[in-house]
Amino acid sequence: MARIAGVNIPTAKRVVIALTYIHGIGTKFAHEIVEKVGIPTDRRVHQLTDAEVLQIRETIDRDYQVEGDLRRETSMNIKRLMDLGCYRGLRHRRGLPVRGQRTHTNARTRKGPAKAIAGKKK
């Protein structure tokens, strides 16, 4: 198994697909990386030479923000919004949907499991 950006890449998959296992690299960036390094898109990870793996690793370190750094920046951005006290920050703080979705009936994923409320006695 090749280890790139602190992630074990599956060896049986194509390089483009395997790179998407790294947080912060989707299909678009994976294709860009493979083109920059000059590896054919149909090549599998176990067929890569050590030099090619090193080139991929250097390209990712130089040009892309991935894994821990990306997660840290995302959490810092959310924390900044919460410290500002803006609407989006308040929604994050309360654990509600941030992007304008309705909350009357839906949003169970964001709000968590339904809380039981005692019904009205007859």
From Swiss-Prot:
Biological process terms in GO annotation: translation
Gene Ontology molecular-function annotations: rRNA binding; structural constituent of ribosome; tRNA binding
Superkingdom of source: Bacteria
UniProt GO cellular component terms: cytosol; small ribosomal subunit
Coiled coil region boundaries: none
Keyword Electron transport annotated: no
Pfam families: Ribosomal_S13
Keywords in alphabetical order: Ribonucleoprotein, Ribosomal protein, RNA-binding, rRNA-binding, tRNA-binding
Keyword presence, ATP-binding: no
Region of interest called Disordered, as start-end residue ranges on this chain: 99-122
InterPro entries assigned: Rbsml_uS13_C, Ribosomal_uS13, Ribosomal_uS13-like_H2TH, Ribosomal_uS13_bac-type, Ribosomal_uS13_CS
Assembly and interaction partners: Part of the 30S ribosomal subunit. Forms a loose heterodimer with protein S19. Forms two bridges to the 50S subunit in the 70S ribosome.
Function statement: Located at the top of the head of the 30S subunit, it contacts several helices of the 16S rRNA. In the 70S ribosome it contacts the 23S rRNA (bridge B1a) and protein L5 of the 50S subunit (bridge B1b), connecting the 2 subunits; these bridges are implicated in subunit movement. Contacts the tRNAs in the A and P-sites.
Family to which this protein belongs: Belongs to the universal ribosomal protein uS13 family.
The name this protein goes by in its record: Small ribosomal subunit protein uS13
Originating organism: Sinorhizobium fredii (strain NBRC 101917 / NGR234)
Gene designation: rpsM
